[in-house]
Structures are given as structure tokens and as C-alpha cells.
From Swiss-Prot:
Keyword Lipoprotein attached: no
Protein name, entry field: Cytochrome f
Binding site for heme: 38, 58, 61-62
PANTHER family on file: CYTOCHROME F, PTHR33288
Residues annotated as transmembrane: 288-308
Origin superkingdom: Eukaryota
InterPro entries: Cyt-f_TM, Cyt_f, Cyt_f_lg_dom, Cyt_f_lg_dom_sf, Rudment_hybrid_motif
Subunit record text: The 4 large subunits of the cytochrome b6-f complex are cytochrome b6, subunit IV (17 kDa polypeptide, petD), cytochrome f and the Rieske protein, while the 4 small subunits are PetG, PetL, PetM and PetN. The complex functions as a dimer.
Organism: Aethionema cordifolium (Lebanon stonecress)
Family: Belongs to the cytochrome f family.
Record key words, sorted: Chloroplast, Electron transport, Heme, Iron, Membrane, Metal-binding, Photosynthesis, Plastid, Signal, Thylakoid, Transmembrane, Transmembrane helix, Transport
Length: 322
């Protein structure tokens, strides 16, 4: 009985360990495949997502240029919550090459660079209507100390091609670094995977070119997908092997003569990155009240002018009758 209990506990412990290991491997593989060239890479490699030139660093990995749009109110009052809607349009029928070489739907991601003092609205300040627009999205700060820079993604593009950010406007009365001015807002949005990793290596979502000119002497299809293309360089007699990852379509065949940098594969990329900007005014409530008072005064003056004119006309009419 003692031996049987020991065996049972040993077997259970081994099964638990095996399950944890498998789960961890699945998580790592899944995370690696979906996070390629998404905001996590920018967060890991750049202190600020916007370079001094105005270029957003996501463009370093997403080489294709695609449109993105942002809608914000023209003006907001201090300590109020407003919507910043980022639109990332694309053809929903398109499929992209995934890291495993298969075809799948496109994901989207975005980075929103707000003026200093503006930040993500706390949940208790977000209205039910705005929460419905946000859906299940989970936003995060680009850095713990950069609350004005928000990132999201990757998320399913078919559901979130429009992303609503709930933003809390600052109050100059409590934040002396903020003033009642017009401020710029910058946005970057991508759909689909990137072509370049931060270390400079290529993903399988881009074109692969020949690293040498010559004759293709052999094309080996690898067991797990992808190809090894052997190029015989006639100029020096050496052989060069180009590795093509899985999921790409070859444009060349054995015996074909090719040139240096000639495309070996078609371009699988159907996504891309775009950036845009908008302006927003942090409006002084006293200025609004003053404007309303001025407009009210103008309206009253017009009314009194009309009444006075009618009174004058009556006096003139009575004098003529007399």
C-alpha cells in the first residue's frame, strides 16, 4: 500500500509538471507569433515612439504605407472625458501569412501620443455609452512614467478597425504644467504583421531576394516548411544557400539564371502602417462664459435696436397723420 501511494503521488506530480511545461510552451509560441512587430517591440526598444523627425518608430518594422485617421473634438473643457477615435481601414477579406506559414486574419494595433497632462480616463469616469464603443479593449501606457502615450494591440482587425480611446483632459487649476492652449495629437496605426524585426532580421511577411547571382542548382523543400535555394555563382565557383521561411511563394525554379537581389518570392504583405495627427483646444471655461455673455449682449442689443426702430416708426407715422 505504501508503494502504491508513493507511485500515485509521483505520477500525479509528473503529470502536473508536464502540463505546466506544455502550457508554458504554448504560451511562448503563441505570444511570439502574435506580437511580431506590434507595440510591444516599440516599447522594448524605444524610449519614445515618436522620433525627432516626427516619424513614429513602428514604421521601422512595418514598411508598407497605409492610411490611418483620428477623430477628436475641436475643443474640450478641463477635467472632462472625451473620445479619440482611431480608424485603421483595410479590406476585411484579406488574409496574411502568419508566423507558422499559414494564412490568417489581420490584427491591428495603435499608438496614441497625447499632449502632456492628457491621459487614459479611469473606469469610473467613462460613460456606459463610451464603454460600449470601447468593447473589451485593454489600453496600456507606453511607459509607467508616460501616461500621455497609450498603446493597444494586437487585437482582431475585423472587430476593432475603429478603436475608441477614452481620454481625460487635464485641469490647469491642479496641474501647473498645463495651459489653455491648442495642442497636437499624434497617432500611428498598423494592420497586419511587420516585415522587419527590431534586430534587423526579416519576418516571413516580406520579399526574399537572392544574395548572389548565378544558376539555381537546387531547391530543397524543408520538412517543416520553407526552402533552401542553392545558387551556383559562376564568377567564382562558390555556392550560396538562401533560406526561405515557410509560407512564401517561390518565383524561381531549378536551372534558372538569376541576378543579385532578384526577388526569389512574391510579396505576401497585405498590411501596413500609417500615421496622422489632429489638434485639440483645451478651453478655458471662463472664456466660454465670457463668449456666451458677449453673444447674449449682442442679441439683446439687436432686440432693443429693433424695438427702438419700431417705436421711432410709430412716432413718425403719428406725426404724418397729424
Amino acid at each position: 500500500m505504501q508503494t502504491r501511494n508513493t507511485f500515485s503521488w509521483t505520477w500525479i506530480r509528473e503529470e502536473i509538471t508536464r502540463s505546466i511545461s506544455v502550457s508554458l510552451m504554448i504560451y511562448i509560441i503563441t505570444w511570439s507569433s502574435i506580437s511580431n512587430a506590434y507595440p510591444i517591440f516599440a516599447q522594448q526598444n524605444y524610449e519614445n515612439p515618436r522620433e525627432a523627425t516626427g516619424r513614429i518608430v513602428c514604421a521601422n518594422c512595418h514598411l508598407a504605407n497605409k492610411p490611418v485617421d483620428i477623430e477628436v473634438p475641436q475643443a474640450v473643457l478641463p477635467d472632462t472625458v472625451f473620445e479619440a477615435v482611431v480608424k485603421i481601414p483595410y479590406d476585411m477579406q484579406l488574409k496574411q501569412v502568419l508566423a507558422n506559414g499559414k494564412k490568417g486574419a489581420l490584427n491591428v494595433g495603435a499608438v496614441l501620443i497625447l499632449p502632456e497632462g492628457f491621459e487614459l480616463a479611469p473606469p469610473d469616469r467613462i460613460s456606459p455609452e463610451m464603454k460600449e464603443k470601447i468593447g473589451n479593449l485593454s489600453f496600456q501606457n507606453y511607459r509607467p512614467n508616460k501616461k500621455n502615450i497609450l498603446v493597444i494591440g494586437p487585437v482582431p482587425g475585423q472587430k476593432y478597425s475603429e478603436i475608441t480611446f477614452p481620454i481625460l483632459a487635464p485641469d490647469p487649476a491642479t496641474n501647473k504644467d498645463v495651459h489653455f492652449l491648442k495642442y497636437p495629437i499624434y497617432v500611428g496605426g498598423n494592420r497586419g504583421r511587420g516585415q522587419i524585426y527590431p534586430d534587423g532580421s526579416k519576418s516571413n511577411n516580406t520579399v526574399y531576394n537572392a544574395t548572389a547571382g548565378g544558376i539555381i542548382s537546387k531547391i530543397l523543400r524543408k520538412e517543416k516548411g520553407g526552402y533552401e535555394i542553392t545558387i551556383a555563382d559562376a564568377s567564382n565557383g562558390r555556392q550560396v544557400i538562401d533560406i526561405i521561411p515557410r509560407g512564401l511563394e517561390l518565383l524561381v525554379s531549378e536551372g534558372e539564371s538569376i541576378k543579385l537581389d532578384q526577388p526569389l518570392t512574391s510579396n505576401p504583405n497585405v498590411g501596413g502602417f500609417g500615421q496622422g495627427d489632429a489638434e485639440i483646444v483645451l478651453q478655458d471655461p471662463l472664456r466660454v462664459q465670457g463668449l456666451l455673455f458677449f453673444l447674449g449682449s449682442v442679441v439683446l442689443a439687436q432686440i432693443f435696436l429693433v424695438l427702438k426702430k419700431k417705436q421711432f416708426e410709430k412716432v413718425q407715422l403719428s406725426e404724418m397723420n397729424f
